[in-house]
Amino acid sequence: MNNEHAEVMEMHMPTEKIVGQTDLYSIKSSTVRTPDAMPRPIRVKAREVNVFYGSKQALFDVSIDVPERAVTAFIGPSGCGKSTFLRCFNRMNDTIEGSKVTGRIELDGADIYDGSIDVVELRARIGMVFQKPNPFPKSIYENVAYGPRIHGLASAKGDLDRIVETSLQKAGLWNEVKDRLHEPGTGLSGGQQQRLCIARAIAVSPEVILMDEPCSALDPIATAKVEELIDELRENYTIVIVTHSMQQAARVSQRTAMFHLGYLVEEGPTDKMFTNPEEKRTQDYITGRFG
């Protein structure tokens, strides 16, 4: 068992054990994640979703419910389909030549793959933060103001200023940049750039925020700040995060879904997934036997 897997095993309750394991796998609780007190309404519903890239099938009959105002983590080894599935939620796979998505994905009950859906509007409602920080080659202010401006969310300069300030505050960045808003966003540190990208997504008032390994390019201090931010944001947004770090999934999520070879193996409350998974593949992945 490598260090990361061992540390994950130390993040939960000592009275609960991974199925079939000895006391070696007993777990104690030290997560920063806020557990859910009660079930939440479903914000995104996926049913029998398949993804093809040309003749190659990358995802097989995936069905899942994503609750609102909670963090759902997608875990699994590289190439398992978790990022492919995440990109289905705001139709980013549409940008890949030869891709095809079948099945049904609903946002608030409406099929997002229906021909009447405005994809630009959809991507405002379901924002995305990528693995590598990608600020626009513009000022800090313009990085955040760009989306609200093109979507017509601000009718006056004062309105735009308020959106920029509020978004940067929600992203935990305002106090660090308020005196240099007109400096290039690319001049910020990596962690600050990622929080700027989160502020940019927030600025257009999304309902859902997708995060594809948002901390993989960050140092531990910047990662901790982003994880704390994720836990704060989930009070107002539905968040889905893809991560290779099971420590991160355990720290920030309320629900976890395990993928392997293009299939959804199982999903459920994060505490249960890490202490009493139903599937052996999940158990083996969490305990470091593969992946």
UniProtKB/Swiss-Prot annotation:
Keyword Lipoprotein: no
Organism: Chelativorans sp. (strain BNC1)
Membrane topology: Peripheral membrane protein
One Pfam family here: ABC_tran
GO molecular function, a single term: ATPase-coupled phosphate ion transmembrane transporter activity
Name under which the protein is recorded: Phosphate import ATP-binding protein PstB
Gene: pstB
UniProt: ATP binding residues: G76, P77, S78, G79, C80, G81, K82, S83
Cysteine pairs bridged by disulfides in the record: none
Top-level taxon of the source organism: Bacteria
Keywords carried by this UniProt record: ATP-binding, Cell inner membrane, Cell membrane, Membrane, Nucleotide-binding, Phosphate transport, Translocase, Transport
InterPro entries cross-referenced by the UniProt entry: AAA+_ATPase, ABC_transporter-like_ATP-bd, ABC_transporter-like_CS, P-loop_NTPase, PstB-like
Function: Part of the ABC transporter complex PstSACB involved in phosphate import. Responsible for energy coupling to the transport system.
Entry EC no(s): 7.3.2.1
One GO term describing the cellular component: plasma membrane
Subunit structure: The complex is composed of two ATP-binding proteins (PstB), two transmembrane proteins (PstC and PstA) and a solute-binding protein (PstS).
CDD domains: ABC_PstB_phosphate_transporter (cd03260)
